[in-house]
Amino acid sequence: MQIDAASSDERYQIRKLDVTDKNKGFMELLQQLTVCDSVSDEEFQKRFEELRSCGDDHVICVIEDLVLSKIVATGSVFIEKKFIRNCGKVGHVEDVVVDSSARGLQLGKKVIGFLVDHARMTGCYKVILDCSADNKAFYEKCGFKEKEIQMVKYFI
């Protein structure tokens, strides 16, 4: 599908996640990122309310294609409160994905910009993320630098 660049800003709306976004393909979009089991409407509603109760400490950004009424990009940032750096805060970017049909439209950069701006406005002294080697160049274009090594231990 070809998108007219002139109408792109009118076609795509960037905003915070809404509970109705489950019906606009939000969960299917996450399946393009990682293993994502089926979530009932009730489970989605409960998790949505739980995250919303965190206020500015956990924000999920989405981009909706207004023509298709479909969520085509998403990402989240959660704020870690620390004792170091004068009780500073760190933003952790997670779960960034752009629908395969909408890649190349700079939507990923818009999601990252939204999340980084949110972290900055809430007083974070830095924003960090983990990514695959395949996505390193994208994040460098968004102003991130490689630093140190990620480690993980799975429980499931």
Regions found by a protein language model. Give the residues of each.
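Conserved N-terminal entry element of GNAT/NAT acetyltransferase domains
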Residues: 1-21
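Glycine-rich phosphate/pyrophosphate-binding loop shared by adenosine-nucleotide-utilizing enzymes
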Residues: 12, 68-74, 91
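A short helix-loop-beta-strand connector motif used in the catalytic cores of GNAT acetyltransferases and
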Residues: 49-62, 92, 150
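Conserved beta-strand in the GNAT
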Residues: 62, 70-79, 97
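Conserved acetyl-CoA-binding loop-helix of GNAT-fold acetyltransferases
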Residues: 98, 104-117
